[in-house]
Amino acid sequence: MFIDTHTHLDGEEFAADRAEVMARAREAGVGKVFLPAIDIKSTEAILDVCRQYPGYAYPMVGLHPEEVRADWREVLVQMKQYLKPENHFIAIGEVGLDYYWSREFEQEQLDAFEEQVKWSVETRLPLMIHCRKGQNEMVQLLRRYKNDLPGGVFHCFTGNEHEAEELLQFDRFVLGIGGVLTFKKSHLPEVLPAVVPLDRIVIETDSPYMAPVPMRGQRNESAYVKFVLQRLAEAYGVSDDAVAEATNAAAKRIFPLAFAE
């Protein structure tokens, strides 16, 4: 059994066959799926999916950096209203910084991220962090809260050894590793074993995006997280079971509420 710690199974891409996708995930050995939000609409959709799959699908709440606009304050006021015990959120996410396409809302992204970092400190819910082209700014911000944060995941890590070491200085955090690991030109099979202990990794799909080899180019789904697990085992020179055990333990450490029942 292993866990897909980051999957957008609430998306419209799965509207026609979500039940089959869930069944294939279980069949592949996926014991739980964790669903990050990106905005208010997706938060509603995620809660619906998680109510349909209790004990299997677990929700997060957060405003994705690419969804941050000038009205971010009003949006976060509305989103925070969802942070009630009956919604059983396991994390604040997916939140962070994304300057890949544009820095138009650079300051707004930083401010919205910091506000949601404060939610994490207040609620003791871990962070699911999305960061593209903004690691320096992210690290600078997180350092101010390092001693107060409960922990979290640096989702979709694709960086180099130096970047990995910098992130691992946040000792309650782990790296989320997905389909990029399996790509032909990926440097992760060398980078990760060099500097990242296996117990500092969780596995993810980011479905419906970033499908791993041999499914690259297709719609990604949670069942395919097994290909990430297998490639990690090859890279570290250990068994698939050893990777499952280590990444499950990391997931349990970071997301205790998903294992509370």
Q: What kind of region is each of these model predictions?
A:
Residues M1-E261:
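Mid-domain alpha/beta scaffold segments of enzyme catalytic cores
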